[in-house]
Amino acid sequence: YTKLPAEAIDYFESIGNYLNVVSNGKLYKCRSTIKEMLTLLPARLFIQTHRAFIVNKRKISKFNAVSVHIGELRIPVSEKYAKSVMQKGF
């Protein structure tokens, strides 16, 4: 069991009933769903970009209507969440 401060988390990726939690290049696993995690995270800090991804807004280096980037890593933005991502204007 590892406790991570929200600010240190780069993103979450849903894999069934588990989440991959990535922080500073390290991978952690947690038993939770995207929906459950969204209720626990500060909305000012995180945004859902896809049914399978939640991203730390402060870690985004660039974005457009189809993807957000954390450094060189490209994370998809689905059509459902594109408007929200573009309105936030990181």
Give the residues covered by each predicted segment:
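Conserved binding/recognition cores within well-folded domains
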Residues: 1-70, 74-77
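Eukaryotic intrinsically disordered, low-complexity regulatory linkers and tails enriched in Ser/Thr/Pro
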Residues: 73, 77, 81-90
